[in-house]
């Protein structure tokens, strides 16, 4: 191979489309069929359940781009200043038997006009050309999911066939265009005149390139995962202006609110306790007990399912755990750790964040700093109190007590002949032996008292009398926290001197003589 040929092979320049197809992890996530525990919709139970399934993250992401686009259009219509606008009243998703996926929604259609600078029809520009978007103005505060100009174009690049339809009622035009062969073929659009009284809509169709994904089509579990996203969108779409109906395969998704959506996971309020709070139109959240005693989160940012969580989850959970720690310490006089609380909880969060940032194009972890959320949310004291009374407080106290008992066990004494490592302690010669019951431990105050006692002891007294000098008033352990007792040096010294064990009850003199190093 010539040096020129070697250099040509070593240094290559690819088109954007080829780079996307060759490096899917960067744009849509893995295209491998992986095993994972995912929340999916189960038709049999009509619930959202966690199940170990085979699914392809990249294929899931293509679907997600489409359904988030539809939800974004709801928000755009609500926020749009234009006068002749139509609010979105429906979002429909269809997954056909051959694997073709269709999204449709009403609301204003796409502007059917040629771009004055690029001389390309605007629908083709935003669907068929990379790095084109209406979301590039950094000064505009948006609470939509789209951001960087890839979006649904990724779905068309990873598809064998695509089609867009849109009706622009303000111009009285309908636009239809087809795309083939991973967006390598863009057919000329068909544009027809329609009455300006026509109802605007947009419909996008794509058939993923299943051969590139290494599968013949969509599995039942994969369809359940996609259907679950339709339920998500029903739960997190703003209904403040107009009720939006969400459909999946011609069936109306029966989710009326975020609270109703939580029922799909944990059952009705009579089945499972949960606490819900909504501070404003941008924040709502609910807490239930985690089914497997492991922290679980279900969260959404601008309609995007952040199944790995993010700063928004930390923001709410840090408030809840901190306030619960303070509440429990005030009520129970027990210092519990945030972990002992968090591991009990399942949290559901829906929020709208201005211009959110994510750790990758897959958008499963939101990393926008709290200061840039564009809104704030303070978890109320009443909400925290209700969570505590769900049983969280009692369990946290029990976990803390068990942990402290385990730590306290490390300071336990035992009935041994010798005790070492205790400063200024004078042990009785016969303590820890068969004659322990005859031994007496004297607790005195300070070294001067120790010297006085020692000077008055005979050699025979030294066989049965031990002395330990205290440094002042001894901690009163009655009702005291286990941790505070375990951290007290004098108490732990006395435990070792006597042979006391945490949690052991000495009910009579027989127990004392049998287990302890001193009888009195």
Task: Give the ranges of each region predicted by the language model.
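Short conserved segment of the HATPase_c
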Residues: 21, 112-132
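Short, conserved glycine- and acidic-residue-centered signature motifs
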Residues: 119, 148, 487
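Activation loop
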Residues: 16, 122-126, 490, 494
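ABC-family P-loop ATPase nucleotide-binding domains
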Residues: 28
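GHKL-family ATPase ATP-binding module
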Residues: 1-13, 17, 23, 31-52, ...
